[in-house]
Amino acid sequence: MSAVKWVHSSRRGFYGCAPAVLLVNCVTGVTGELSLLHVVSRETTVLFFGAPDLCEGVDRVNFSPDLIALVRSKVSGSSIFDQLKADTTALEKVRELGFAAPTQTRVIAVANQKGGVGKTSTAVNVAAALAEAGLRVLLIDADPQGNASTAFGLEHPEGEPSVYDVIVEGKPISQVAKVTELGENLQVVVSNIDLSSVEIDLLEAVGRQSRLREAVRNYLIEVNRSGGKRVDYVIIDCPPSLGIITINAFVAAGEVLIPMQAEYYALEGLALLTRSIDRIAKVYNPALHVSMIALTMFDKRTMLARDVESEVKTYFPHATLETKIPRSVRIAEAPSYGEPVVTWDPRSTGAVAYKRLAQEISMRGITQPGVAPKEN
């Protein structure tokens, strides 16, 4: 046991394992791209596979060729092994390709009138992944539930400055936005329950549908005048409804990203949402268009998921993103720790998928129209 080394204990476990104290031995070259890890938890001993960089600084143990052959025959081809290998390959590709910076600020509304489709998870994880890649992002939590604010561990009690003050009172975004743990690259305009009364408060207000657009434009102009780093993305997490808040988001945005589950009810909802977006574009914002559709909670094993994907691609061939977000406990768990999954458990399948999605979105930014700040 002299060559064995205690590595660390983890609240998250290891690649989906239950939390455990990990005892790791590394053998490089066992699978080519991956290394064999010998993981000892408090309760049991298992053989596992992981990325080579996890093994840095850990003493090596030379398992016998017979043992290696046995492990490869038992594990290679299993769903766990295949997924881990796919995640590692995907991460390497993300690092290799990098993220493209848009030529001008892209304002993206993340919207779906149906709740529970991964809308907020998509908004916060895409924002975090873009910020991690060095791009500057402003995330606007426009949902009265404030889940996007919670996802970053930001307090948003009733009565404190929030997006409500921006839309109703005309407060500058710069006075409300909060810096996250990712630093200046990611700021969040928090939301709270005050926003639920905005329908009544703006009932007779002049230009009530364009309040957020003016606030965003003024913020971008303010950043440019101050000589600060240009804002690459403004991402707006919309509420699951088509009320005045969502209309404000659509009027402010140049693009709409629609996260949707791979189920047939979602197809009906998609048709209704796109019709509403078209109407708003004709009346208030000709630049608005559905630029991206992301399939979430996707189970590639089911025929239903594949059929829905095919239908969406048939009707929206250019908007449907190739990256699909799988069902993942890690994605659901992360907000309880005040982090998006891409930072909380960056090697998990859900985190890898969102990093790929964010990269795909950034690559589309080379040709996608954005909303540049204009001075009057």
Descriptions of predicted regions:
Residues 9-17, 22-376:
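P-loop NTP-binding core
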